């Protein structure tokens, strides 16, 4: 669904694990990585769209996640000129998104990238909370910064004040440190 200004209504999903790391996925057949996201259909509310996209792209059903929070309003990004399809109607110039932060209550084994005819992703990993800012395609970076910044407080609410677990290379939580305010490096555990 595209609004009157040319923005496609969309949901973005930040899936976190118990260690405060986030799900990061590589687009099928490409080198780019991103959070799961997808369009909102006509007569579909954002929550329903989020659960549908979560299943289609990540294979997770609602019983395997907990909604922690969502952004208060819409976050927007504009597509670079070369990605705008001028001959399509209605014209889409970008995305207008509600972002969610979820906690995985199931296990990594519940994540399946093959739940749709054309999978969106072909690989995934857990990364440090701020890592996506250094890795996402440039035109989505500001929206990612806004979503991560707004939703960080909600994620921290269930943890010791100002701390998140940090994992060693084996994926075991080793210590508590203050939550970083700057992007940090990638995870070593990739699927």
From Swiss-Prot:
EC number(s) on file: 3.6.1.-
Motif placement: Nudix box: 38-59
Region (Disordered): 162-191
One GO BP: mRNA catabolic process
Necessary cofactors: a divalent metal cation
GO cellular component terms attached to this protein's record: cytoplasm
Enzyme class, broadest EC rank: hydrolase
Keywords: Hydrolase
Functional summary from the UniProt entry: Accelerates the degradation of transcripts by removing pyrophosphate from the 5'-end of triphosphorylated RNA, leading to a more labile monophosphorylated state that can stimulate subsequent ribonuclease cleavage.
HAMAP family, A to Z: Nudix_RppH (MF_00298)
Protein name: RNA pyrophosphohydrolase
